[in-house]
Amino acid sequence: MVLCGVCAFLGLYCTQPLLPLLETVFHASKTAVSLTVSAATLGVAIAAPVFGILTERLPRKKVIVASVIGVSIPTLLAATSQTIGQLIFWRLLMGLTLPGIYAVVVTYIGEEWPPQRMALMMSFYVSGTALGGFLGRVSSGVLAETFTWRTSFLAIGAVSLAGAGAIALWLPPGRGRPQPRPSAAGSLGDRRGVVYQVQELFRIRRLVATFAVGFNVLFSLVGVFTWITFHLSAPPFSLSTTALSYLFVVYLVGLVVTPTAGYIITRVGLRAGVAGAILCSMVGVLLTLAPSLPAVIVGLTLLSSGVFVTQTATQSHLRVASPPEARVTAAGLYLTCYYLGGTAAGSVPGIFWSLGKWPACVAFIVCMQAAALAMAVIGWRTQAAQAESAAA
């Protein structure tokens, strides 16, 4: 599970520490180079529901391995880009192959482990995503400054290919997958009514709230780590490409925090766990306004730790709230909303940057986090809790 998470996130955000460098190399605007981040997340958002529907009855392991191979190819080809437009294209293509990992791994975990261990196993997968995000960002920055930015893509693509081989060897085939059952026409499990199925999923209030929380969670993470690179590369910080890449060391905290969070969430519940995690992230974003680099690093650490815990809680809640016959499709819809948040974060904060630089970006992102907090606390209430509240 950890290796699946690493491969999923190794290349997704590898251009973040390179943005100031790419701005110079391609003589492009900040908004244009930020599209190298947005294009990848947009690809995930577009393909996620398709993967969810098409792969629901395919062998989970084969889909995961094929997707990791599919991710590595456009990553390698990105090194051949001669214009910013070509680089954006390869990033989009890479994103289109990623949902085969994301959507299917979440479902695989739900099928292979009992409910009482699901949050813990999900935390291991999320820890892998934290490690992958860290390795991708740091290696791309260091390799770009030591050699060239093209070397970064070649190295990440090669490692992804090796990861596909390791997953093929080590990941066991699914054992707990339920056998397909005939579905009544018009039911959520009816393959003839995909549109109907999606419509019914969006009628489940807890799922809609989960989709919205996912959108806002990734929006805050990508928004901060994309646009703060421009803030920290300018005076008074004036950080180099390598120094910017080392900021992502804070992702390693997620390797410790997230598994621990799995135990905590099991004890305190999903709503309380996600509320505390989002509040932690909000404090972290506000700390990045400090003129001190150590304070900024502490803020980024709190932000990323809170996001990883929120991911664990949200993905666990997704499994609980989804109808059993439509869990892969629900996971695909969640990923669409989640990565639409990442796509918007690559460009929308640019509007606020033009109005008031980094402080304006922070104000907007904190508002988005507050909205996510409200949706989780209110929207995740079970029917029993709502009935008790109404009776009171």
Residue ranges and their predicted role:
Residues Q86, P115-Q116, F124-W170:
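Helix-loop-helix hairpin linking two adjacent transmembrane segments in secondary transporters
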Residues I46-G85:
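Conserved MFS/SLC helix-loop-helix module at the cytosolic interface between two early adjacent transmembrane helices
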Residues G70, P74, G85-L93, P294-L302:
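Paired small-residue
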Residues A48-P59, V256-G269, W353:
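Helix-to-loop junctions at the C-terminal end of transmembrane segments
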Residues R271-T314:
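C-terminal transmembrane helical hairpin of 12-TM major facilitator-type secondary transporters
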